[in-house]
A protein has these predicted regions:
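Non-catalytic substrate-recognition and accessory regions of acyl/acetyltransferase enzymes
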Residues: 1-73, 83-103
């Protein structure tokens, strides 16, 4: 299953970058799925939307970073996360990387 492979790749990234194993808590929803990561130095919530249904002005096949708090090197870690998604998202059919909120 594509979703499972994506989660495995994301968990591997988190393990290699931060040393956290199997950190992703995955929740299915009507649009795709969401991943919540709450670790000592990392607090992230990311939506993987196959179908946006017009919500939030996000296009279909979007990865939406809702929350990304890194205890150390926030800007550098966020750029690295974006690089990971830009490399891997085409493999799984995702076309857009977006952020939510922030005014």
């Amino acid at each position: 299953m594509v979703q499972n492979d994506l989660i495995l790749d994301f968990n591997l990234y988190l393990c290699e970058k931060f040393g956290y194993k199997n950190s992703c808590s995955v929740m299915q929803n009507a649009n795709g799925f969401c991943v919540d990561i709450r670790e000592r130095d990392l607090d992230c919530y990311i939506r993987f939307w196959e179908y946006s249904c017009g919500r939030g002005n996000f296009p279909d096949w979007s990865i939406i970073i809702v929350r990304s708090n890194f205890k150390k090197n926030q800007a550098e870690s966020l750029k690295d996360l974006a690089r990971f998604f830009k490399e891997y998202m085409p493999r799984y059919g995702y076309k857009y990387l977006c952020t939510e909120g922030g005014g």
